[in-house]
From Swiss-Prot:
Residues 35-67 bind DNA. The keyword Nucleus applies. Keywords: DNA-binding, Metal-binding, Nucleus, Transcription, Transcription regulation, Zinc. The keyword Transcription applies. Transcription factor that regulates the expression of the he gene cluster that mediates the biosynthesis of lovastatin (also known as mevinolin, mevacor or monacolin K), a hypolipidemic inhibitor of (3S)-hydroxymethylglutaryl-coenzyme A (HMG-CoA) reductase (HMGR). This is Transcriptional regulator LovE. InterPro entries: Carb_Metab_Trans_Reg, Zn2-C6_fun-type_DNA-bd_sf, Zn2Cys6_DnaBD. Residues 89-124, 331-358 are annotated as: Disordered. GO terms for biological process: nitrogen catabolite activation of transcription from RNA polymerase II promoter. PROSITE patterns: ZN2_CY6_FUNGAL_1, ZN2_CY6_FUNGAL_2. It comes from Aspergillus terreus. Lovastatin acts as a hypolipidemic agent that works as inhibitor of (3S)-hydroxymethylglutaryl-coenzyme A (HMG-CoA) reductase (HMGR) which reduces HMG-CoA to mevalonate and is the key step in cholesterol biosynthesis. Lovastatin, simvastatin and related compounds are widely used to treat hypercholesteremia and reduce the risk of cardiovascular disease. Furthermore, statins such as lovastatin were found to be anticancer agents. It is found in: Nucleus. Its main location: nucleus.
Length: 503
C-alpha cells in the first residue's frame, strides 16, 4: 500500500478542462506551463498554477474556447524533431552554416499522441465566424522566424543569408580607353587656332551682311532712303507744316530715329571689317598640313560668300537709288528751278505787285542744320550726288576686297565699272576688260571661285545673253551708268542756278 501510495503520490489529477479518454488517473507526465493557445501566441499564460489541476486561463475563458495543456516532448525526441524541422524547412545547406542557434522553446512541437494533436488542430482552426481581437498568426513557421531575428526582413532569410556581391561592370557599359593622341607641334596648333578665329570673324561679318541684304530688299523700298520722311521736307505743303508746327521737336526726333535705321553705314562698316579679316588671313602663316589646308578652304568659301553678299547688296541699293531718283525727277521741281522758270530780273521784281522768287521757297524748319540746307532746297540734286557717292564708295570697297582675295585687277567686278565718269569710256574699257578676261585665266583659288560666280552672273556677257538670274553684274553696271549720267546733266544746271540767285 505504501508502494502504491508512493507511486501515486505525485500524480496529477486531470482537470475537467483537460478531459481523459479513460476517466481515471494517468501516470506522471510533464505538461507545459502555458496552454496551447498562449504557447502558440508566445504570450504569458494566466492559468491558475496553485491548484493541482490546471484551470482555464483568462484569455481562453474570454474567447470562449477550450483551454488545453499539452505534454512536453522528451529532450531526445525534441532534438530529433528540431533537426527534422530544420531540414524540411530549408534544404539549402548554406542556411545551416550561417544560422544562429535556436532555443528549444521556440521550435514547433511534434506531439505523438492523437489526443493532443487533435486538440491542437481544433484549437488552431477556430470557426470563421469568430472575430479575433488580436493579430493571429496562421502557421508555426512564421512564429519560428521571430526566434531567428528575421521578422523585420521583407525578403525572409535572403536578406541576411545571401552574401553581398560587389558591383561588377556591365559588358554593355564598358568604356574603351582612348589611346593618347600623338603630340601636336606648337606651330601647327597656333596656325589652326588662328584660322579658327578668322572663321569666327568671317561668320560674324557674313551674318551681318545677310541682315543688311534683307533690309535692303524688303524694308528700303517702303521708305525714302536719302531724305527724311518728315513734315519739313520740301515736298510737304505749307498747310501740313502749319498744322504740325506745335510738335516740331517731337517729329524731328522721330524722323531722325527712322533715318538712322538705314543700314548704309552698317553696310560700309561690314565691308571694311571684311577687308580687315581678309588681310589678316593673307598675312597668316601657312603650314603644309591637311588640317591647315582644310581650315583655309573653309575660310576661303566663307570670304567669297561675304564678297558675293557685298555685290548683291550694292546692286540692290543701286536699283533702288535709280528708281527713286527718277520718281523724284518726274514728280517734283526744285525751288530754284521754279524761280528760274519765272526768270525775274531785279527791276521786274521791284515793279511787281509784291511777288518774288522767294515765294517759291518752302518754309524752313527751325531745327534745320546748315549741312542739310542743300537737300532741303534741291532734293533731286542732293539725291543724285548722294547716289553717286554711295556707288563710288561701294565699288571702291569691292575692288579692295578683290585685291585682298588675290583676284587679278582685270578679273573683278570693279574692273568692269570705270570710275572716270564718262559712259563712253566705261563701254570701251568694259570691252577691253572682257577681252583681257578671256585671255587670262584665274590663278588663285579665290579667283577661280569668283570667276565661276561672275561667269554665272553674266559679268562677261551682255545683259540680253545672261541667264535668268545672271543679271546681277549687268544691273549694277547699268544703274551705275544711268545715275552718273543724270548727275552730269544736272550738275551744270545746278551751278548755273546757284549763280543766278538774286541777292
Amino acid at each position: 500500500m505504501a508502494a502504491d501510495q508512493g507511486i501515486f503520490t505525485n500524480s496529477v489529477t486531470l482537470s475537467p478542462v483537460e478531459g481523459s479518454r479513460t476517466g481515471g488517473t494517468l501516470p506522471r507526465r510533464a505538461f507545459r506551463r502555458s496552454c496551447d493557445r498562449c504557447h502558440a501566441q508566445k504570450i504569458k499564460c494566466t492559468g491558475n498554477k496553485e491548484v493541482t489541476g490546471r484551470a482555464p486561463c483568462q484569455r481562453c475563458q474570454q474567447a470562449g474556447l477550450r483551454c488545453v495543456y499539452s505534454e512536453r516532448c522528451p529532450k531526445r525526441k525534441l532534438r530529433q524533431s528540431r533537426a527534422a524541422d530544420l531540414v524540411s524547412a530549408d534544404p539549402d545547406p548554406c542556411l545551416h552554416m550561417s544560422s544562429p542557434p535556436v532555443p528549444s522553446q521556440s521550435l514547433p512541437l511534434d506531439v505523438s499522441e492523437s489526443h493532443s494533436s487533435n486538440t491542437s488542430r481544433q484549437f488552431l482552426d477556430p470557426p470563421d465566424s469568430y472575430d479575433w481581437s488580436w493579430t493571429s498568426i496562421g502557421t508555426d513557421e512564421a512564429i519560428d522566424t521571430d526566434c531567428w531575428g528575421l521578422s523585420q526582413c521583407d525578403g525572409g532569410f535572403s536578406c541576411q543569408l545571401e552574401p553581398t556581391l560587389p558591383d561588377l561592370p556591365s559588358p554593355f557599359e564598358s568604356t574603351v580607353e582612348k589611346a593618347p593622341l600623338p603630340p601636336v607641334s606648337s606651330d601647327i596648333a597656333r596656325a589652326a587656332s588662328a584660322q579658327r578665329e578668322l572663321f569666327d570673324d568671317l561668320s560674324a561679318v557674313s551674318q551681318e551682311l545677310e541682315e543688311i541684304l534683307l533690309a535692303v530688299t524688303v524694308e528700303w523700298p517702303k521708305q525714302e532712303i536719302w531724305t527724311r520722311a518728315s513734315p519739313h521736307s520740301p515736298t510737304a505743303s505749307r498747310e501740313r507744316i502749319a498744322q504740325r508746327r506745335q510738335n516740331v521737336w517731337a517729329n524731328w526726333l522721330t524722323d531722325l530715329h527712322m533715318f538712322s535705321l538705314d543700314p548704309i553705314g552698317m553696310f560700309f562698316n561690314a565691308s571694311r571689317r571684311l577687308l580687315t579679316v581678309l588681310r589678316q588671313q593673307a598675312q597668316a602663316d601657312c603650314h603644309q598640313g591637311t588640317l591647315d589646308e582644310c581650315l583655309r578652304t573653309k575660310n576661303l568659301f566663307t570670304a567669297v560668300h561675304c564678297y558675293i553678299l557685298n555685290v548683291r547688296i550694292l546692286t540692290a541699293i543701286s536699283e533702288l537709288l535709280l528708281s527713286q531718283i527718277r520718281r523724284t525727277q518726274n514728280s517734283h521741281m526744285s525751288p530754284l528751278e521754279g524761280s528760274r522758270s519765272q526768270s525775274p530780273s531785279r527791276d521786274d521784281t521791284s515793279s511787281s505787285s509784291g511777288h518774288s522768287s522767294v515765294d517759291t521757297i518752302p518754309f524752313f524748319s527751325e531745327n534745320l542744320p546748315i549741312g542739310e540746307l542743300f537737300s532741303y532746297v534741291d532734293p533731286l540734286t542732293h539725291a543724285l550726288f548722294s547716289a553717286c557717292t554711295t556707288l563710288h564708295v561701294g565699288v571702291q570697297l569691292l575692288r579692295e576686297n578683290e585685291i585682298t582675295l588675290g583676284v587679278h585687277s582685270a578679273q573683278g567686278i570693279a574692273a568692269s565699272i570705270s570710275m572716270s565718269g564718262e559712259p563712253g569710256e566705261d563701254i570701251a574699257r568694259t570691252g577691253a576688260t572682257n577681252s583681257a578676261r578671256c585671255e587670262e585665266q584665274p590663278t588663285t583659288p579665290a579667283a577661280r571661285v569668283l570667276f565661276m560666280f561672275l561667269s554665272d552672273e553674266g559679268a562677261f556677257q551682255e545683259a540680253k545673253s545672261a541667264g535668268s538670274r545672271g543679271r546681277t553684274i549687268a544691273a549694277l553696271r547699268r544703274c551705275y551708268e544711268d545715275i552718273f549720267s543724270l548727275a552730269r546733266k544736272h550738275k551744270h544746271g545746278m551751278l548755273r542756278d546757284l549763280n543766278n540767285i538774286p541777292p
